[in-house]
């Protein structure tokens, strides 16, 4: 069984053939070892009972009914009993039927089959380690290509052909006869390698440390080469560098995790527990089954056929054996991933079978649907809406949701403060929503962060911590700048609320997961809290000026004078009193120089006004100033709007707050 204390995480990695056998093999009291599936049968057509040594065998996977063997005898069972009891007649263990959910079997392949994930998933790990192209590796795996096997003190096929290179007529007649005999076929099997066996031997001969050292030397040689000036050659060199880096990283991962490269070629194929690939009886004895059972059956059929051919290799043509090896490889490919294999296997309705990869991946896969999609306590869910008045690290939680989530904390404080005599009275006070409840709730959430999560959680910013604020309504309020990390918007998206309970979880949420501590993307280091969508539109509306160039507005502009203001406070006061609008043009007195203003040199001079005292007033498009006789500016006015002034004030406050931090 799965021990929660010893096994705290799940890791997916390559398993060795011995480890797969250890998962499945068990020894009966009579010394017989079970676990190997040798027959492609599932249930008997008449009795609907599992076939012996088949895909649903009770000797391998356990009894269908608790305490009842295949013979129908009931013996009963006791959990955690050191002595395991078996039926002497059928060899089935008297135990709980739940063991069929985790007991595995295995198929001993007659010929190694390459794992399609490491062959065809790009980039191909096998091709990277072997320094071969993907096309060459695929041709070798599917028996379209042969490799010579150099053996010490034994000639290989290529040397034999060179030795027989004579022009004598006798040799021309003798050689074709030799290459078509049985002796040559055995000679070819000894000297030539193809299929998964060739890949297995090449991978097993790799020395990972030596491969890493050689790859570093190749990288240094390529890095010393200068640009050739030819874009094609430069791209080719860069592509070679990328392949070398990929090979070094892959070899390091294999070496550090103590994984052998030859494990990417399967000689033992694990069989999933029968409860994970069920076969169900419906009306009138009709059976429906999982697609995995059909794919397993095809693997066993073809593997057994290959075993028969190899046992009769003297009378079986070599070409037929090679073709059967390819069929076994294609059957294993379809079982693991039926979408990327050479031959997509379909049922009688021309529907592709659902393979193992399709069952575990995706939103409805085994991991996200069954393992990650669990409902948990102290959690809630609601629609998100924008909260423009919130700080970056705050979120608005509806009062009803907060009362329900923090109910145990409220009850504890009510009893500790002697405001409620018992649990029942405390719950009654919460249901009546007495005023004291909200005071206690605000005190609790002040020092208790919450976690917000939006599915799918594709990276670590998909779940962040916030300081909760009680709000009215039924929706969760969120600062718009944190939407980038969640990939959320306010068009009906929902988010889940979780409460960290332990002190360790609360400390992690407060110091590592708060939204104001996750401003950069973990993928590329770029800022992720940037304004977008509604925020950009709001900034545009806030800072735009009144409409110009339209006839109906030109007449109003001529009638109304542009007001002058001395400082920000006068502008904000006039705006709050509704004397001016957000987009009305105004002249604002500027007390600094014009170096900070944009495009001051590019603006055209519209008008120069000369006064009797010798002063001059120069008027430009967005600013004007007064000069004395010595050409010194003493009064400067900027052409702006109240909206731009408000935006500038907020920007100054943010910069000053950042500098203080």
Curated annotation (Swiss-Prot):
Zn(2+) binds at residues 69, 71, 87, 90. Gene3D superfamilies: 1.10.40.90, 2.40.40.20, RNA polymerase II, clamp domain, RNA polymerase Rpb1, domain 3. Keywords: Chloroplast, DNA-directed RNA polymerase, Magnesium, Metal-binding, Nucleotidyltransferase, Plastid, Transcription, Transferase, Zinc. Its cofactor is Mg(2+); Zn(2+). One of its GO terms (biological process) is DNA-templated transcription. It comes from the Eukaryota. Binds 1 Mg(2+) ion per subunit. Pfam families: RNA_pol_Rpb1_1, RNA_pol_Rpb1_2, RNA_pol_Rpb1_3. Mg(2+) binds at residues 489, 491, 493. It catalyses: RNA(n) + a ribonucleoside 5'-triphosphate = RNA(n+1) + diphosphate. One of its GO terms (cellular component) is mitochondrion. GO terms for molecular function: DNA binding; DNA-directed RNA polymerase activity; magnesium ion binding; zinc ion binding. InterPro entries: DNA-dir_RpoC_beta_prime (IPR045867), RNA_pol_asu (IPR000722), RNA_pol_N (IPR006592), RNA_pol_Rpb1_1 (IPR007080), RNA_pol_Rpb1_3 (IPR007066), RNA_pol_Rpb1_3_sf (IPR042102), RNA_pol_Rpb1_clamp_domain (IPR044893), RNApol_RpoC1 (IPR034678). Belongs to the RNA polymerase beta' chain family. RpoC1 subfamily. This is DNA-directed RNA polymerase subunit beta'. The gene is rpoC1.
């Amino acid at each position: 069984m799965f021990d929660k204390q010893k096994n705290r995480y799940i890791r997916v990695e390559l398993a060795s053939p011995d480890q797969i056998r250890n998962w499945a093999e068990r020894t009966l009291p009579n010394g017989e070892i079970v676990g190997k599936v040798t027959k492609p049968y599932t249930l008997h057509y008449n009795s609907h009972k599992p076939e012996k040594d088949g895909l649903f065998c009770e000797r391998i996977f356990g009894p269908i009914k608790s305490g009842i063997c295949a013979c129908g005898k009931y013996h009963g069972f006791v959990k955690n009993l050191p002595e395991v009891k078996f039926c002497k007649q059928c060899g089935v263990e008297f135990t709980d039927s739940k063991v069929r959910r985790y007991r595995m079997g295995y198929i001993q392949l007659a010929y190694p089959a390459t794992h399609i994930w490491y062959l065809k998933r790009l980039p191909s790990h096998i091709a990277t380690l072997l320094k071969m192209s993907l096309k060459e590796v695929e041709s070798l795996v599917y028996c379209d290509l042969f490799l010579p096997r150099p053996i010490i003190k034994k000639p290989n096929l290529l040397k034999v052909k060179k030795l027989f290179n004579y022009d004598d007529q006798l040799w021309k007649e003798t050689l074709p006869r030799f290459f078509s005999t049985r002796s040559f076929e055995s000679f070819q099997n000894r000297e030539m390698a193809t299929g998964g066996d060739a890949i297995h031997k090449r991978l097993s001969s790799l020395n990972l440390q030596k491969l890493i050292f050689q790859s570093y030397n190749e990288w240094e040689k390529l890095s010393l080469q200068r640009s050739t000036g030819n874009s094609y050659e430069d791209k080719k060199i860069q592509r070679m560098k990328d392949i070398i880096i990929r090979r070094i990283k892959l070899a390091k991962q294999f070496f550090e995790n103590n994984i052998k490269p030859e494990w990417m070629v399967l000689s033992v194929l694990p069989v999933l527990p029968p409860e994970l690939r069920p076969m169900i009886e419906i009306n009138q004895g009709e059976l429906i089954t999982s697609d995995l059972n059909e794919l397993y059956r095809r693997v066993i059929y073809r593997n057994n056929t290959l075993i028969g051919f190899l046992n009769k290799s003297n009378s079986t043509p070599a070409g037929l054996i090679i073709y059967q090896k390819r069929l076994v490889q294609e059957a294993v490919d379809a079982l693991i991933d039926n979408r990327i294999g050479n031959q997509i296997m379909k049922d009688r309705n021309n529907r592709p079978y659902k393979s193992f990869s399709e069952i575990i991946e995706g939103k409805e896969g085994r991991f996200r649907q069954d393992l990650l999609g669990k409902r948990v306590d102290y959690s809630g869910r609601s629609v998100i809406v924008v909260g423009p008045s919130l700080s970056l690290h705050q979120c608005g939680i509806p009062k009803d949701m907060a009362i329900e989530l923090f109910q145990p904390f409220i009850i504890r404080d009510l009893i500790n403060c002697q405001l409620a005599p018992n649990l029942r009275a405390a719950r009654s006070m919460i249901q009546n929503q007495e005023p004291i409840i909200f005071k206690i709730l605000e005190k609790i959430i002040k020092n208790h962060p919450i976690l917000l999560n939006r599915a799918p959680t594709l990276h670590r910013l998909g779940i962040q911590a916030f300081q909760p604020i009680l709000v009215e309504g039924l929706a969760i309020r969120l600062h718009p700048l944190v939407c980038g990390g969640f990939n959320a918007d306010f068009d009906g998206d929902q988010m889940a609320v979780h409460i960290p309970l332990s002190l360790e979880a609360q400390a992690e949420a407060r110091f590592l997961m708060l939204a104001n501590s996750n401003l950069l993307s973990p993928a590329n280091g770029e800022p992720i809290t940037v304004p977008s969508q509604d925020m950009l539109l709001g900034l545009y509306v806030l800072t735009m000026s009144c409409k110009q160039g339209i006839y109906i507005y030109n007449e109003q502009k001529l009638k109304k004078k542009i007001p002058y203001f001395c400082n920000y406070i006068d502008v904000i006061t006039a705006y709050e009193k509704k004397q001016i609008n957000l987009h009305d043009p105004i002249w604002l007195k500027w007390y600094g120089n014009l170096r900070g203003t944009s495009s001051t040199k590019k603006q055209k001079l519209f008008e120069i006004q000369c006064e009797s005292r010798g002063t001059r007033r120069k008027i430009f498009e967005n600013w004007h100033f007064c000069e004395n006789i010595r050409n010194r500016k003493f009064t400067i006015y900027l052409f702006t709007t109240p909206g731009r002034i408000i935006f500038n004030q907020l920007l100054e406050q943010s910069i000053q707050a950042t500098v203080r931090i």
